[in-house]
Amino acid sequence: MIYRLKKNIEFIIVYRRGKSFANKTLVLYVLKNKRNKDKDGIAYSKVGISVSKKVGNSVVRSKCKRLLSESFRLNYNNILKGYDCVFVARNPMRDSDYFETEKAMKNLIKKAGLYYDEENGIKSN
């Protein structure tokens, strides 16, 4: 199950206290959160997605959000748990397809040191 950042204050905390990583199409803000645990005490990560009106009209913004959500969902098992992540779309994302979006997202997750390759048991930095 993918947990989401929903409240404005959650986004603000990640923006202010977290570290940022950027590439051409995305910006990633990451904050370690020790409180992200389910009933069984297992840690999980939360994701928030932000797409400004500068990126495009509502159709374009919605497409960007869907692409980011799907990329995160499919790569969730390869991301270290216990972090709050906020992805902010930049203008060039309006023209990118799913594969470019996923590549940009993986690039940022690896830059942040949160990517974990399950097959090889390797944490990427």
UniProtKB/Swiss-Prot annotation:
It comes from the Bacteria. GO terms for molecular function: 3'-tRNA processing endoribonuclease activity; ribonuclease P activity; tRNA binding. GO terms for cellular component: ribonuclease P complex. It is an enzyme of class 3 (hydrolase). Its EC number is 3.1.26.5. Keywords: Endonuclease, Hydrolase, Nuclease, RNA-binding, tRNA processing. It catalyses: Endonucleolytic cleavage of RNA, removing 5'-extranucleotides from tRNA precursor. One of its GO terms (biological process) is tRNA 5'-leader removal. Pfam families: Ribonuclease_P (PF00825). SUPFAM superfamilies: Ribosomal protein S5 domain 2-like. The keyword RNA-binding applies. Consists of a catalytic RNA component (M1 or rnpB) and a protein subunit. RNaseP catalyzes the removal of the 5'-leader sequence from pre-tRNA to produce the mature 5'-terminus. It can also cleave other RNA substrates such as 4.5S RNA. The protein component plays an auxiliary but essential role in vivo by binding to the 5'-leader sequence and broadening the substrate specificity of the ribozyme. Belongs to the RnpA family. NCBIfam families: rnpA. This is Ribonuclease P protein component.
